[in-house]
Amino acid sequence: IELISHNTQAHGDYDALEGFIRIGHEYGLEIHAWVENFFIGTTGQSDALIAESEKRDWRCIDRNGVDNFPNEYGSFVFLNPYNRECRDLILEIYREMLENYDLDGLHLDYIRFSEPQRDETKADFGYNADIIAGFQAQYDTDVDPRTLASGSEMWRNWCKFREEIINSFVKEVYDLVREINPEIWISCACGPDLANTPTTIYQNCRDWVANGWMDEVFSMSYSAGLNYPIENGQLFMRAIGDDAFYSVGLSAFGTTERDVLLAQTDGCYRVGCNGVNFFSWGSLFQHEEGYEAAQTASVYRDKAVQTYALNRMLKAGADALSGKLERVYGVFAPENAALYEAHK
């Protein structure tokens, strides 16, 4: 792929993906490639890679023509998701990974447009000329979408048109994965505000689930408070039902207290979520709150098992019951009567 060079800053010429897969499989871990779709980094990074000067028109622009999204992490650049060349480039990257590496899954992050600008303009994205022309052709109108009143019927159509751009790309990824290896797991990271993401970042994970394109949905329910991730998890579970697996994204990168993170994990389990995901791996092990040690001593003291791996799940359940018989119920055996009396 001529437009992309190997990133040598972190590991030189070492093939980190191959290393993760090989070593992870030695430890019995699944390795899923975490990809970012149309988000290609910050302006400084992107200028040196695929958004070079001759490809500047590939960038997605907001209603004022701005082609990046400034925030505390830099100025984010998204490719135009309607542009066929951009879509084909990304799909070709995924094909290369899926055909040449023994991956267990593909995790779609940033599967959306950029969020609106945070300045006083609140400008939303998707105003490239080809996107506008496509919208006008589909709805047989010459209206300029910049003039649409929020909440009007045509504004809703404009939002839906951009949503369908993302929906159709998810379908293309799904078709690619199933063509190469139907056993590869497809998951996605979704914004937590289910009600509004279809009209702000044009992301509608419920559509993907309903069409059978997702094996698992991961909600980015990040909060330092106890209740929000649990309540958000319940909302997603009602929306997804039994059509896909669902895991709650918990924050290990911020100021969440250790005991709160443990309680969030336990709470999500108790309301029936299939699992939790900690963002991110590095934070989980490096955080000053000692997250990793606390997790392995409590909620993750036993080895995890995937809920979709039936044989391993049944064995894990039997092992857990056997352990309880020894550690807990054994206390009530006649020979331990004295111990029981001492703790009454």
Describe each region flagged by the PLM:
Residues 10, 17, 21-22, 32-100:
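Active-site-adjacent "subsite" loops/lids of carbohydrate-active enzymes
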Residues 28-32, 76, 104-107, 183-187, ...:
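Structural preference for beta-strand elements that scaffold enzyme active sites
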Residues 127-256:
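Glycoside hydrolase catalytic-domain groove-lining segments
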Residues 36-38, 110-113, 191-193, 222, ...:
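Active-site beta-loop-alpha junctions enriched in small/polar residues
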Residues 213-231, 235-236, 242-343:
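Substrate-binding cleft of secreted/luminal carbohydrate-active enzymes
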